[in-house]
């Protein structure tokens, strides 16, 4: 949960939260949309991690997970920019817009990759999905409520460095825990 919450700060989905909150000013459907989209996306990612866990020998898995965590550590240092331009909500409203936008924004994102890695490492699909989803909500719900005024004061560079160090430490521990 902490890993995903820290990795999410300054991420494109957090920027998406900020944009949705500023544009539509409807926190409840936005947060519910984040919850539903994240549960769906991270369930798929976690299932992939479980499949990888079952497929690979423990030593091979350890090296892949450790190397992947180190790669995510490097990736965490790169700031995200939100490329999507949101249009007016569909006839289904802000909730559906948020679900679709978040699900798509999470594809191939750091937190989705982290979910795959954590599920492969811990072989506990439900706990990983719940934990990563809570991490997403911890990072995004305050942004929805605080809007741009509070988000402008967050030291994103320092948080990215902290997230990178956390992923690097997890990667190194994973690689060398057998020794």
What does each model-identified segment do?
Residues 5, 9, 39-40, 74, ...:
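Hydrophobic/aromatic residues within the transmembrane alpha-helices of Major Facilitator Superfamily
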Residues 134-143:
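Hydrophobic alpha-helical transmembrane segments of multi-pass membrane transport proteins
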Residues 172-179:
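Juxtamembrane boundary at the C-terminal end of a transmembrane helix
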Residues 1-54, 114-135:
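Juxtamembrane transmembrane-helix termini in multi-pass membrane transport proteins
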Residues 1-2, 98-100, 145:
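Short hydrophobic "helix-edge" motifs at membrane interfaces and signal-peptide entry regions
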Residues 25-94, 142-153, 159-165, 172:
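Membrane helix-loop-helix hairpins that form the core translocation module of multi-pass transporters
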Residues 83, 87-112, 118:
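Selected transmembrane alpha-helices and immediately adjacent juxtamembrane segments
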């Amino acid at each position: 949960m902490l890993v995903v919450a820290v990795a999410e700060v300054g991420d494109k989905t957090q920027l998406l939260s900020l944009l949705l909150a500023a544009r539509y000013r409807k926190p409840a459907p936005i947060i519910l949309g984040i919850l539903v989209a994240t549960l769906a996306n991270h369930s798929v990612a976690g299932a992939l991690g479980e499949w990888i866990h079952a497929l690979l020998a423990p030593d091979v898995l350890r090296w892949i997970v450790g190397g992947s965590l180190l790669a995510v550590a490097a990736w965490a240092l790169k700031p995200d920019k939100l490329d999507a331009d949101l249009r007016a909500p569909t006839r289904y409203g802000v909730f559906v817009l948020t679900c679709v936008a978040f699900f798509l924004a999470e594809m191939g994102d750091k937190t989705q990759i982290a979910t795959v890695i954590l599920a492969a490492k811990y072989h506990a699909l439900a706990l990983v999905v719940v934990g990563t989803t809570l991490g997403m909500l911890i990072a995004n719900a305050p942004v929805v409520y605080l809007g741009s005024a509070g988000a402008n004061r967050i030291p994103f560079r320092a948080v990215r460095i902290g997230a990178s160090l956390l992923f690097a430490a997890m990667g190194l521990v994973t690689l060398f825990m057998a020794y």
